[in-house]
């Protein structure tokens, strides 16, 4: 589904050169303060955002930390995706997922895939560790400030990231939210 209704011209005047070396993707839903969670749970579940996440990542490779995996229903890997879980626990195993124990091991595993097909899906530590290796960020911004204990790096404060597409305003009950596509631009 193409949630982005307005692209490039509005945001960049068409003159931003986007980096295209290692195009790993990152995807997250954030509130006004770039918060992503509390007590290892999402802040809110918005069906349209979940649908966008599902459609964007199905058939792709998703990279996550152990806590993110354990926050899924029954702690099970996501269906119809290659799940890669990064944990420092050497004994950790999970059915239907690839478990790696270091960034080096993760990078060796990722060499098997087209980086266009790799989506970093959380949580906070994984986002922080892998943001610099991503060139595209799909961010759902919820116009509300939640009580939270986990955050995504604020891309609006990072000059190397620019919004290249956005959606019209979306609503879910009394919540307003938008889909934004950020891309890392060349210096």
Identify the residue ranges that each predicted region occupies.
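Short, Lys/Arg-enriched N-terminal segments with co-localized hydrophobic residues
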Residues: 7-23
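Enzymes that bind and transform nitrogen-containing heteroaromatic metabolites
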Residues: 22-187
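Short, small-residue-biased leader/transition segments that mark boundaries at the very start
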Residues: 1-4
């Amino acid at each position: 589904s193409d949630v982005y209704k307005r692209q490039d011209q509005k945001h960049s005047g068409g003159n931003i050169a986007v980096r295209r070396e290692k195009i790993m993707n990152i995807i997250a839903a954030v509130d006004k303060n770039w918060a992503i969670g509390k007590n290892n749970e999402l802040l809110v579940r918005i069906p349209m955002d979940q649908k966008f996440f599902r459609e964007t990542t199905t058939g792709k490779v998703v990279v996550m930390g152990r806590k993110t995996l354990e926050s899924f229903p029954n702690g099970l890997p996501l269906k119809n995706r290659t799940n890669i879980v990064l944990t420092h626990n050497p004994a950790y195993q999970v059915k239907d997922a690839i478990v790696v124990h270091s960034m080096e091991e993760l990078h060796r595993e990722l060499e098997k895939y087209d980086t266009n097909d790799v989506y970093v899906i959380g949580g906070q530590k994984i986002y922080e560790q892998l943001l610099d290796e991503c060139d595209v960020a799909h961010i759902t911004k919820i116009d509300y400030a939640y009580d939270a204990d986990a955050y995504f790096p604020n891309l609006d404060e990072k000059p190397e990231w620019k919004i290249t597409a956005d959606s019209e305003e979306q609503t879910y009950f009394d919540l307003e939210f938008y889909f934004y596509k950020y891309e890392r631009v060349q210096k």
